[in-house]
UniProtKB/Swiss-Prot annotation:
The lineage of its organism: Eukaryota, Viridiplantae, Streptophyta, Embryophyta, Tracheophyta. GO terms for molecular function: acyltransferase activity, transferring groups other than amino-acyl groups; protein homodimerization activity. The active site is at residue 164. Pfam families: Chal_sti_synt_C, Chal_sti_synt_N. CDD domains: CHS_like (cd00831). One of its GO terms (biological process) is polyketide biosynthetic process. This is Inactive polyketide synthase 2. It comes from Rubus idaeus.
Amino acid sequence: MVTVDEVRKAQRAEGPATILAIGTATPPNCVDQSTYPDYYFRITKSEHRTELKEKFQRMCDKSRIKKRYMYLTEEILKENPSMCEYMAPSLDARQDMVVVEIPKLGKEAATKAIKEWGQLKSKITHLVFCTTSGVDMPGADYQLTKLLGLRPSVKRLMMYQQGCFAGGTVLRLAKDLAENNKGARVLAVCSEITAVTFRGPSDTHLDSLVGQALFGDGAAAIIVGSDPLPDIERPLFELVSAAQTILPDSDGAIDGHLHEVGLTFHLLKDVPGLISKNIEKSLNEAFKPLDITDWNSLFWIAHPGGPAILDQVEAKLGLKPEKLEATRNILSEYGNMSSACVLLILDEVRRKSVANGHKTTGEGLEWGVLFGFGPGLTVETVVLHSVAAST
């Protein structure tokens, strides 16, 4: 007679969860940050609000963003004028867009990840789909399963309305699924489109205007599995540990609310200060088992909520400028893509590591950290272990 313990042991993988492939995608429409204020105030018929436009121009100038990608084109916005007002009922129009476009953009990223992985898509056992853009039933996970032609028996998990920390959440869940299901291959997808948050300017809600200056559209997909097949699968990073915490005294620091007017975004407290004040505690808890206290000995992937967060974290921890170079580069080239950001940064780190001739996928270093920050204030901390870089 087989015991429960024997069954449980047989169900579990032997090695750590490993990222086996990464794919990314953006909509084709690219907007230049330097000219975006002119476009934004023109399309929202707000050009007469010159003082507010000057404030927005300063926000964009200080954002350190060069360009962003957006599904919303001028033509789409002209066809949906309610989306250009600050608080006009417009949820139906927004929903009709995102329930179609979110899975499509996710498919583009997932297809690239599957191609890099090099295995048959029928070998994908689990699907995790994450988006803050819209809600539907059956969800984007179901739609992506159909679009990709995955097996009907693929085990799906749909994450809606998590926000900017959720790239870390996706990695944490993919790690648990891979390590607790022997032979599992998890496709995890983050897909974000700002059609739910775009709106006209308001003199009384400058925090909403901050979001209009920062957010962009994008998707990223990863394949995660334990015990990579030798000579068939190529590991990129090992997921060593993952944790989530709510920062103290941070209630209401970042809020998002889905209403008839779409998803409204609110910054109510000193978010950069709260994160920088508490980040070392998260680092100490994560790296104490490894006896690591030198934060400059790590490679870094941090959600780029905005330049102020990165500046204060860098100063608080005494990080060398190159530590957040990949993070700042993704912010500059794409803006804040919510949950997808950290996965694009991860892709940037491994590609630059190979291009620059580093010995490991983590910029030549062995250990790394990935941080997600978002509503709550919630922080996700993932400890990464690099592998030997291969061209």
